[in-house]
Amino acid sequence: MRAGERKWGGWRQPAAIAVAVAFLLPLWFMVSGSLREPGLPPPRAPELVPSPISTASYHEAFDLVDLTLYTVNSLIVAALTVPLAVLVASLAGFAMLLVAGRARVVLIGLSFVALMIPVTALLVPRFTMFRWLGLIDTWVPLIAPALLGLSPFYVLLFYWSFRRLPRELFEAARLEGMSPFGMWRRLGMPLVRPVTIAVALLAFIASWGNFLEPLIYLFDPDLYTLPLGLRSLETLDRTNYPMLLAGAVVATAPVVLAFMIAQRYFLHEDRGAGWLGR
C-alpha cells in the first residue's frame, strides 16, 4: 500500500461514520417526533427519545385519511412503473451498444439533450395529450413515462454498463447465431445485475415520491397516491406535528427498506457482477 493510500485510508472510516450520522439523524428525529403525543409542538431542544413514547399519532393519521389505500395505490403504480422502466431502459441501452459509428454518437447526444430538458417544461404538453386521450384521473399518466425508460439517465447507465463488458463476448455470441434479443437476455442482463438493481431502486424512489404528476392528473381521492395523501393530512391538521411526522415515517419506510435490501448488490463482486464497481 502506498503512503498516500495509508494516509487517506485512516480517514475513510471516520468520514463514512460522519456521513452516515448526517443522513441518519434526520430520520431518527422524524421517527422520534412521530412517537410523541398527538398535538404537541416541536420540542425546543433535539429529543432523541420522547417521553412518554406514544403511537397515538399513527392511529390518528390513519383515522384522519385513508393512508392504507394511498399506500396500496402507490405500491400498484410502482409495481407497474419499475419493471417497465428497467425493461425499456435496458433494451434501449443495449440497442445503443449495437448501433455503430456516428449514429451511436447522435443517440448519446440526444439522450444528454433530453436529460437536460426540465420536467416542468413537459407538463403542459403531456397534460394536453393525456386529456385528448381521455386518460386524466387515471394512473396511466403516472406509468406512461416508464414506456420511455422513465429517464434518459437510466438508458445511459445501462449503455455504459454494457459497454464495459468484453466485446468478444458478444462477437462470439453473434457468430454462434444468437439474436440481439438473446444477447441482451442471456448475456447482457445477467452481467449487469448490480446496475439493474440500482436502476430499479432509483425508479422505485422516483415513482414512490412522485408528487407533482399525481397532483396534476388525479382528482378522485380513491386514486390518490401516498404523497397526495400526506398533502391531505397536512391540509386537515397542519399544526399536529407528531401526526404529520407519523405520515412521513409511513412514506419513508418503504424507501429505506428497499435501499437496505438492494444496497448489498450495488458493488457486489461476483461472477460478472462487479462491472459497476470497477
Each PLM stretch: what is its role?
Residues 1-6:
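Short, Lys/Arg-rich, polar N-terminal cytosolic tail immediately upstream
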Residues 9-278:
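A structural signal for multi-pass alpha-helical bundles of membrane permease subunits
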